[in-house]
């Protein structure tokens, strides 16, 4: 059987070893970059649907929009890093921001649905991936 030895350049091997040591910090920065893109789109969609298309004057306090944000980067039980776009809790009146967002997204028997999360997810998927790729390239380039 034939035998082959592949010699990697020392600089490449050094960068790979540094990458391994900084995986968590790089993953945080990459996910943060993608999360910011998604957050901006969700925020703009939310502003567009809140108070629009109502038969009566809007009673929006702006609290739902202000509570929208990004979670810190977390590591799940399988070792995967993730970040979430969501609402901080609770509201000043004691109700749940997630409940209000769910009512807006899916509607009720008396209120028409005004989706803002699902359209944002569909619209920014490619942009998020591109932002994450460029953040990754930048971080790897700094090694």
Predicted regions and their residues:
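Short, Lys/Arg-rich flexible segments
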Residues: 1-84, 92, 98-143
């Amino acid at each position: 059987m034939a035998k082959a030895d592949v010699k990697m350049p020392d600089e490449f091997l050094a960068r790979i070893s540094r990458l391994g040591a900084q995986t968590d910090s790089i993953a945080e920065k990459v996910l943060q970059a993608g999360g910011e893109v998604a957050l901006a789109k969700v925020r703009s969609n939310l502003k567009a649907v809140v108070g629009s298309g109502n038969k009566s004057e809007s009673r929006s306090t702006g609290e739902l929009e202000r509570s929208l944000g990004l979670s810190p980067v977390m590591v799940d039980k399988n070792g995967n890093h993730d970040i979430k776009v969501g609402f901080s809790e609770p509201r000043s009146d004691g109700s749940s921001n997630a409940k209000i967002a769910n009512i807006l997204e899916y509607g009720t028997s008396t209120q028409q649905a005004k989706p803002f999360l699902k359209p944002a997810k569909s619209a920014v998927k490619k942009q998020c991936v591109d932002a994450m790729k460029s953040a990754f390239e930048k971080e790897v380039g700094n090694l």
